Amino acid sequence: MKRTFISLLLTITLQAWAQDSIEVVNIENPAVQAYMADSTYYYNDDCDLTVITKYTNCDLYGERLDRPAGKSISWTPTVASDNIAEIRITLSEHSDYSDSLTHSPTSTKGTSYLITNLLPNRIYYYKAEEVHTDSTVALLDEGKFRTVGQVRMIRVAGSNNVRDIGGWPTSFGVPIRYGKLFRSAHLDEVTPEGYHDLVENLNVTAELDLRGLFRREPHLKASRMGENIDFIRIVADSYGLSSQREKYAQALIWIISRLREGKSVDWHCGVGCDRCGTLSFLIEGVLGMSEVDLCRDYELSSLKGHKRYRGHVGFRKLLPWMKNHWPDTDLTQCFYNYWIESGVSEADIEYLRSVMLEK
């Protein structure tokens, strides 16, 4: 018995040591890391103070602050670029590369690549391969790393301000699940590379467009990403919790229906801030996010340069409106009441929570 216990303890110690020896990759870019760690961030009903402006400096934090950090890999080509048909990067949470994702740099002349759109708290295995014009394959690089962080920004070539709403803590004691619901700017100009990352790798096959006709061709009734995308346009105004109840309820019911079909959903307006931000606020609220985190998430869009601070004339009214309508109720219940009174069924809300809250 003693020997068995010692062996078990040794195994656990070796496993912990092995994990600690793996390269750690934070999925959050430096600006997001600093913003999320800022302990001076708090909530007040006036929403008159913000810290996000300290983290929008591109000279300090780099360009494209709405994009994630990732794992950088590099290699030395084995043949001339004219003889390379494709550079193929394979990523998996399994050492045998089962259930893998692929990435293909757009140029065969490159010697480096940034692997992004990672989930946090995972161990990933990767390999970079050179596929030659004669169909032979050469291994360029391989290894493993583990990820940390919370905010999962998504790189989609041809779009911006894309985020997975997962990872935020909730009043239910578990975080929101990653990989199901996404928010973004418009998807009209997504490139083939962006399509591969968003649709094929992330399974985003349902698109909800909140823009009005003046922001989009009136005749367009399908996704620009192709006919295989389940598409709907629900024209909604920003921040109108009372006037837009019917629109938001229609949107949530549609989203839940797509989740029931096993699809991941992206909703967007033009730049992914106002209409998109309002719907995100309402969904995240009923999933149990706190006042502070609802504000934090809204302000993340400022990292794209859109200056959507929580003191924005529209957003700053949202939380007080909720709390004033149900003054003797906790915040999560306020959002629940809002959706029920807007026409969403209890069964739909419970299904949303069952899918979107980590077990």
Protein language model annotation of sequence segments:
Residues 9-18:
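Hydrophobic h-region of N-terminal signal peptides that target proteins for export
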